[in-house]
């Protein structure tokens, strides 16, 4: 007989914004095993993989998925959760804002912290559609889900860390460990940079629920303060607003078409200084769209954020997903829209940007 533990429906109750969550991020603290509330577990796992709405006969989840293939199965290992028996559970979210845990009998998993979220990669769901490139999409999706969980843990005042399992546990390569906060290990002091940020219009939890992939944008230009906000909350600082796996591997470029106060062109973004360096003059959006298989939203967006890496490491792809989740939630928080674009000719994108790096993602950004 199945043992199902219903979780509280997800409701946006916290007042913190993504700007506040990344300032006091979960990964900055020592992770201490201490009893946490079931409500906290419920919110954190929802922010990773919960059903936020239904469309086209399926659930839309808190983390985006290439072609809505949803290759992840999510498990929770409970160690010290008030109101939940210790053990391994399968996470289920079959309807908007509703979710539950199903006990997995006869399985024992070593974990740290108060509870751990495991992401199993059912790769054939995505590679069956996209071939070998699907493996990159899966790692990016794990990054989105992991960062969603860590952001919610930050808002709840808990500690959390992403961990790579070596060796992997079957098809589980990455996990997120959540616990109470111990000593603060790192300080985050975001740089001032090129412009003051714009305030968020939504709380973090509201943004999690309302996040969608947006492909149609108005012709209204973006503002510098909006651009500053997205970059500050997504990738800025000597200590960035997400946890690295040993080192930072992702670089950031902007293809600007229509931002008030910023000439069209390609800009290299410096996370450490929060500054922009113009490396190509003139609007390249049409060429970038051609490199992205003719996706018109790339051509029409006032801004395209392009994430690249000089590394061959698969961990760079996971990191791109973490940055990407920040970009999605930052844009949503500002009343803007974006979509993760992973289908493009790598060499052509690099040529448009004039960089000798491997492109990982394109994020067109605009007003819905």
Q: Where are the regions that the model predicts?
A:
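N-terminal amphipathic, basic helical "cap/leader" segment at the start of enzyme domains
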Residues: 1-113, 159-160, 168-170, 182-301
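Small-aliphatic-rich amphipathic alpha-helix that forms the alpha element of a beta-alpha
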Residues: 44, 74, 115-167, 230, ...
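A glycine-rich helix N-cap at a beta->alpha junction
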Residues: 168-189, 353-368
């Amino acid at each position: 007989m199945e043992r199902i533990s219903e979780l509280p429906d997800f409701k946006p109750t916290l007042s913190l914004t993504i700007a506040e969550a990344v300032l006091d991020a979960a990964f900055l603290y020592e992770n201490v095993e201490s009893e946490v509330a079931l409500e906290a577990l419920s919110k954190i796992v929802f922010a990773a993989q919960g059903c936020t709405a239904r469309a086209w006969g399926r659930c839309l989840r808190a983390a985006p998925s290439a072609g809505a293939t949803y290759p992840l199965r999510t498990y929770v290992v409970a160690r010290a959760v008030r109101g939940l028996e210790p053990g391994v559970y399968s996470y289920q979210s079959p309807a908007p804002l509703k979710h539950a845990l199903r006990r997995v009998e006869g399985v024992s998993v070593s974990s740290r912290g108060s509870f751990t979220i495991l992401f199993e990669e059912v790769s054939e769901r995505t590679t069956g559609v996209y071939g070998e490139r699907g493996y990159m999409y899966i790692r990016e999706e794990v990054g989105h889900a992991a960062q969603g969980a860590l952001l919610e843990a930050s808002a709840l005042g808990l500690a959390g860390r992403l961990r790579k399992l070596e060796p992997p546990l079957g098809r589980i390569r990455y996990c997120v460990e959540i616990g109470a906060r111990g000593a603060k290990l790192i300080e985050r002091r975001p740089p001032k940079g090129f412009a003051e940020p714009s305030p968020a219009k939504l709380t973090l939890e509201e943004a999690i629920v309302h996040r969608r992939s947006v492909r149609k944008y108005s012709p209204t230009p973006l503002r510098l303060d909006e651009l500053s906000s997205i970059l500050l909350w997504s990738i800025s600082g000597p200590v960035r607003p997400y946890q690295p796996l040993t080192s930072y591997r992702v670089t950031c470029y902007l293809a600007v078409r229509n931002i008030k106060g910023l000439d069209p062109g390609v800009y290299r973004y410096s996370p450490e200084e929060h500054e922009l360096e113009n490396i190509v003059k003139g609007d390249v959006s049409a060429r970038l769209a051609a490199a992205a298989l003719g996706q018109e939203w790339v051509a029409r967006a006032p801004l395209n954020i392009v994430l690249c890496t000089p590394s061959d490491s698969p961990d760079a792809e996971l990191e791109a997903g973490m940055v990407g989740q920040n970009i999605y939630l930052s844009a949503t928080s500002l009343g803007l829209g974006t979509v993760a674009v992973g289908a493009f000719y790598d060499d052509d994108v690099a040529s448009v940007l004039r960089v000798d790096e491997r492109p990982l993602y394109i994020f067109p950004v605009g007003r819905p």
